[in-house]
Amino acid sequence: MNKSFIKNTLKLMLSISMVALSVNSSFAAYNPNGFTLQQETGLNQLHDTSNLENRRYENYVKQDYQNYRTPMPDAVKDERPQYSGNTMNTGVSQTQSTNSVYIGNVTVDPSEILSPEEINSIISQIQGRNVTIGEIQQAVNEINKLYASRGFVTARAYLPEQTITGGNIRIGLIESKVGNLTVNGNRWTRTKYITDRVGQEPNKVFDIVELEKDVVSFNRYNEGVSLKANLKAGTTPGTTDIQINTEEKFPFHLVGVMDNAGRYSTGHIRGGAMLYADSLFKNRDKMSIGSYFSGGATSPFFDYNVPVNKKDGRVGFLFTSTFAKLKYGDYRALDIRSHGYQYSLYYSQPLIRRPDFELKSYTALNYKRARIEYGIIDYHTTDEVTSAEAALNLRKDTKHGIWYLNQTAYYAFPILDKVSNYFKYSGSVTRLHDFSHGVIGQLRGNYQVIPNNKYIPYLDQIQSGGLFTVRGYNEGIMIGKNGYFMSGELIFPIMPSNIRIGEKERPFLGRVVKGALFADHAGIFPRRAEDRYDGSYFLASVGMGLRIQFPGSLTGRLYWGFPLIENRYETDKKYGRFHFELTLAPDIDALLNRRSTKEVVVEERVEAKPAPNEPVNNYPDVRHYDYFFDVPGAAL
């Protein structure tokens, strides 16, 4: 009983002491040993949100790369009867017995594709003079070349059967119209979603080039579903029927994660479970839901977005949160707790899309709230941030790799909290480089700048240290309003992928184990009132690692980081630190296919067309990408 009384008394004294130290700051409270509330439990909100953003970005890069393909030769298969190319009608005759005939007037059927000026520029060459049948045929061929240059390969000019009398001649035009448009095999995608994006309307002039472009674009930007178009002669003369065949994967995915990227005060070891969908309500709307768990923290999250236009503009809602309690360390008796939330309503819109270049815009309205409670007298501090942000995201493919760049402008409005009134500028860059022979380089960098020396809620500060930033240090040990981060990593095979046994080649460990060497560096600069150590601003480390594909669907990233700079914020100093992440992502689609009793239909093999001299896709083999992100842990 006496021990319990002494313990409670000690808690009360420590709590009152903490309150006294909090008077001069509405957020940070220090004891004589330099203890900060936000760095122990409050920062879990920022720490976990940052980790989720890192995962989201890695997943974006992975999906973007894996979906990048050159146009398939059979994206559009033409099964209609083909014309021989001879548009001369042998029934054309002339009254004169000579080899030439006078043409005074040429009548051409109305066209929805070619303008009168374009047609007149061709037929004017044979009007008002004697011409041969060959010259008339040449004019017809010129019109067909004009059709071909526009991509309308189903349109053609021809000479109908006629007798040339009085110098008058008629050139006929056939401009095929779209007939019936049907979609097959789309269990998880609405028919209207597909037909809205192939751009072919019934009774409109059929454009095969536009159709192929639409099909390739659809396959490029819609994960888990691909289209193939078959063309057939329409049931109505002068029309082309389009049959869209859909191949879909099961749209729901499960991912389990375990790592040691948690904070020491709430538990280094974390577990997580995530469910995400590629087409929740059959409109290619994406949903992610899940949570991370550690000894002292729970971090649930939810994200949902839906396409709102044919150019893949998306509106979405994001919710992330952290409920944390300090359970480890010298200050666990203070009963420190934190509750953090972030709500975002966002809109993303591709602005430019080319095979080797993409520019996207992103805008969002955010509401963030964080509350820290401690002590048995329930003392608390609360921060609220209402903000708006706008960003541009760029992807540029080069001969040996890909660039990703981001630039964001952010403003916090003083609506709910007068202190929250500031601008924030941030950006990032990533370079993936293929050195060939299985050697891949990855460069990453980001920065954040908040002008002035005002108090900034920790929810909008930048932090560094740990698995996703500077390896070799504890997770999230540094935080400040300004900062930067740089990392370089080289990923390479450490063993051969195949070995020869006798006359046969067998798979070897190089297929499942990759080596890695890295160097990380960061600088974090807090405002002067929060600069406890006045100069301990930098982190730097080097290290090595392994990326392993375990049997089944289990993958892992293992790193050993060695600090090069002794940082005073690092209370648990180690010469080297081990980081790991294990991810279990079962391929549900493959499992369902194994259980399926449906008859497997073998498609007729179509001979591929020769590749162009300068193929757009520099990475047709997606295994290149596995060297970068062979851990599919990013579910967002």
What are these regions (language model features)?
Residues 2-27:
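Gram-negative bacterial Sec-dependent N-terminal signal peptides
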Residues 29-262, 274, 290-299, 445-447:
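Periplasmic polypeptide-binding modules associated with outer-membrane biogenesis and secretion
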Residues 29-33, 191-192, 207-401, 563, ...:
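Gram-negative/organellar outer-membrane beta-barrel architecture
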Residues 190-200, 271, 325-332, 336-338, ...:
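Surface-exposed coil loops of outer-membrane beta-barrel proteins
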Residues 231, 256-260, 273, 289-293, ...:
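Transmembrane beta-barrel strands of outer-membrane/channel proteins
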Residues 271, 343, 359, 388, ...:
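Hydrophobic core residues within well-ordered beta-strands of beta-rich domains
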Residues 373, 378-515, 519-521, 525-527, ...:
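C-terminal outer-membrane beta-barrel translocator/porin domains of Gram-negative envelope proteins
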Residues 535-556, 563-568:
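C-terminal structured "cap/appendage" subdomains that terminate the fold
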